[in-house]
Amino acid sequence: VATIRDVAKLAGVSVATISRFLNKNGYVNEDTKLKVEQAIKTLQYEPNAIARGLAGRKTGTIALIFPDITNPFFAELARAVEDVARMYGYTVILCNSDNQADKEQTYIKVLKQRYVDGILFASYNLRSDDVEALKNEKIPLVMLDRAPRDASCSVVSSKHLEGAQMAVQHLMDVGCKKIAHIYGPQETVTGRERLIGYEQSVKHLPWYSPSLVEPGYFRVDGGMAAVENLMQRHPDIDGIFAGNDTMALGALKKLQRMGLHVPDQVALCGFDGIDLTLIVEPEITTVSQPIYDMGMLSTRLLIKKIEGDIKEEQTHLFDVKLITRGSTERKRNDE
């Protein structure tokens, strides 16, 4: 990776001149500008955290990159991040990637050029080599709720696998005899661990079949489509564990459109604990994550890394809690 000193050497000027050119601070004559521009192009140099470190300054800005601004889970995370950042004198740049890897990479490139002090990632698409590249450029980062496989970085998340097992056990406890799972993207730790938790809970049971799982992509429309496909394959499904509340909302809508009563014909449980599960009828049982607390802790952790208070990578996993509501409150057989 080219450094500011490499650019200065190739252009035949001082590092201070390169710094003035990059920061548009002070006079640089036109001939020198052309030389610097050519050197930057030749070396494919990007002004980034290295230049920021040489300049010896911070911007008081952090970024949060997340995949879906329409998902209330990420809205609550963003609220917590902004609240804590403001307490410490930082401004937050919110970057919605729409779950598009190329858009995410564009954000990362722009954020490096604008000298943000650190980045919070709630990303589906970040790879372990992306993490290593950012670490090599001395950009503090924290992964929030998800992390790439084999990546060495700080993570704030919750106990997804344990929560999935709680959800399935609850559905069995209310009398479900055939439970399906609508799962999220398997490139995410959230989608992957919740699917594993489901499978570990039911794969030993006589009714289990791999065809009882269906992708829902963490979206409302994904939940609706998954229910349609699952019920076509297995009309006797009487319990559904959706891997997040957004998919659970879609599942509820589709079940009701199909004329199936929730919970008496099909009991339904989601995961996350977003407020939208309270405004539908019936209210949706969910495995609740402490979303706001996760956002607060991840921001404090990032700021401590920025300010040099901690050097080592840390992992924090929050407990989850089952909240039972109308979507699993079945009538007792003796009533």
Name these PLM-found stretches.
Residues 51, 105-108, 131, 168, ...:
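Short hydrophobic/charged patches on amphipathic alpha-helices used for structural packing
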Residues 30, 45-117, 196-199:
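Amphipathic helical "hinge" segments at domain boundaries
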Residues 100-101, 122-127, 246:
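Short beta->alpha connector loops
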Residues 1-60, 329-332:
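N-terminal helix-turn-helix DNA-binding module of bacterial transcription factors
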Residues 1, 42, 80-88, 136-143, ...:
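Bacterial carbohydrate/catabolite-sensing allosteric modules
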Residues 14, 60, 117, 177-178, ...:
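Short acidic/polar active-site loop segments enriched in Thr and Asp
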Residues 127-135:
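Active-site-adjacent beta->alpha loops and helix N-cap segments on the catalytic face
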